[in-house]
Regions:
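Transmembrane helix-loop junctions in multi-pass membrane proteins
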Residues: 1-15, 47, 117-121
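Structural signal for alpha-helical transmembrane segments and their membrane-water exit/capping regions
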Residues: 1-7, 35-44, 159-162
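Entry/N-cap segments of selected transmembrane alpha helices
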Residues: 9-36
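Loop-to-transmembrane-helix entry motif
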Residues: 17-25, 54, 58, 94-101, ...
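Alpha-helical membrane-inserting segments
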Residues: 26, 30, 34-42, 114, ...
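Membrane-interfacial loop-to-helix junctions in multi-pass transporters
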Residues: 26-27, 41-50, 82-88, 120-129, ...
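Helix-loop-helix junctions within the multi-pass membrane cores of secondary transporters/permeases
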Residues: 57-138
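Transmembrane alpha-helical segments and their short flanking loops
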Residues: 108-196
Length: 196
C-alpha cells in the first residue's frame, strides 16, 4: 500500500475497487434472490415473505461478520419460516460452516479484478479449476470474520501464478484487504442462503 501511495496509484486503484465492490454486492443480492425464489417454489411459500423473514439474520451477519455468531438469529428466522425444529437445528449450524456462496462470489470476483488491474493473464482455464478447488476448500472455512479469504490464500496461485500468488506477496495482500472491506456482505449472503 505504501508503494501505491508513493507511485500515485492509490486513487486510480480505489476508483476500480469501488466498482468491484458494487458488482459483488449486486451479485450477492442476485444470489440471495435466486435461492429464495427456488426455495419458495419448492416449499410453495411466498419467496418475498421468506426474504422478509431473513432480514434479522442478514443484518446480524452484517454487524458481526460471523456465520457462527449469526446461528441463533438464523434459527429464529427459520422458525418464522415454518421450518420444523429438527431440520432447522441440523441445517442452520451445518450450513453456517459449509455454505459459503457469498464468499465464493467475492473471492472469485476480487481475484478476477486483481488480475485485470495487474495485467495478469486470466482465462476460463484458470478460473474454473480455481472455483472448483475453492468450493471444496470453503467447506473447511471457519465461520469467523475473514476466515474464507484465509482459507483461499493457498489456492490463489492458481489464478495469479506462482510468483504473484505468493501468500506473503503484495497481490495477495490486496486480495485480503479487498475481501475484508466487504466481508460483512459476503457473510450476510452466506447466512441468508442457509435459510433458503
Amino acid at each position: 500500500f505504501t508503494d501505491m501511495t508513493i507511485s500515485g496509484k492509490t486513487f486510480a486503484i480505489l476508483s476500480i475497487l469501488w466498482k468491484v465492490f458494487l458488482v459483488v454486492i449486486i451479485m450477492h443480492l442476485i444470489c440471495i434472490t435466486i435461492q429464495f425464489l427456488v426455495a419458495g417454489t419448492v416449499s410453495k411459500k411466498n419467496p418475498f415473505t421468506l426474504i422478509k423473514n431473513q432480514i434479522p439474520g442478514y443484518t446480524t451477519a452484517l454487524g458481526t461478520q460471523s456465520s457462527a455468531a449469526t446461528i441463533p438469529v438464523n434459527l429464529e428466522c427459520a422458525k418464522n419460516d415454518g421450518v420444523c425444529e429438527q431440520i432447522r437445528n441440523f441445517v442452520v449450524p451445518l450450513c453456517a460452516n459449509i455454505h459459503m456462496a457469498g464468499s465464493m462470489i467475492t473471492i472469485t470476483a476480487c481475484a478476477t479484478a486483481v488480475c485485470l488491474m495487474n495485467q495478469l493473464p486470466i482465462s476460463l482455464g484458470t478460473v474454473v479449476p480455481f472455483i472448483m478447488t475453492l468450493g471444496v476448500a470453503m467447506v473447511a472455512s471457519p465461520g469467523a470474520p475473514g476466515g474464507s479469504i484465509m482459507t483461499a490464500l493457498p489456492f490463489l496461485y492458481m489464478v495469479f501464478g506462482a510468483e504473484a500468488g505468493d501468500p506473503d506477496g503484495a497481490i495477495c495482500a490486496i486480495m485480503v484487504a479487498l475481501y475484508i472491506t466487504q466481508d460483512s456482505f459476503g457473510t450476510a449472503c452466506n447466512v441468508s442462503g442457509d435459510n433458503a
